[in-house]
């Protein structure tokens, strides 16, 4: 089916977007195909429909902090840098999700063995990602979320040393 398509025309659903030059937010989410619609619904609920750019890499926040695929982190940082100039972004949203294959592959399986342990692993990595972004881009706000495959989304708040 794909091989025989030379030109494809899709309907332009939002003609008014052609004139926009700014997006307030960069969403960094996982590549997982199971949550594409839910991710769009979240951004709409946050009032950010038509006001965000998106980068998708395996593991979302894990892409920034993992030690095996460090080029993913560089990609995120380079993207933030250019989008500050191109679209004047003001905030970053990391959207991790439960039952993530990248997490299963890149961190110890026992850290994901219960819902509580999985939440703790995501919280730790989301907070590491937040810290990296705040150090390199102190002018940007950083928000972190964890989505379940059931569509339930929890905001993960910044941890301070006293909280540990």
Curated annotation (Swiss-Prot):
Lineage, broadest ranks: Bacteria, Pseudomonadati, Pseudomonadota, Alphaproteobacteria, Rickettsiales
Species of the source: Rickettsia bellii (strain RML369-C)
Signal peptide: none
Molecular-function GO term, any one: carbonate dehydratase activity
Disulphide-bonded residues: none
Alphabetized InterPro entries for the sequence: Carbonic_anhydrase_sf, Pro_CA_2
Taxonomic superkingdom: Bacteria
Protein name in UniProt: Uncharacterized protein RBE_0009
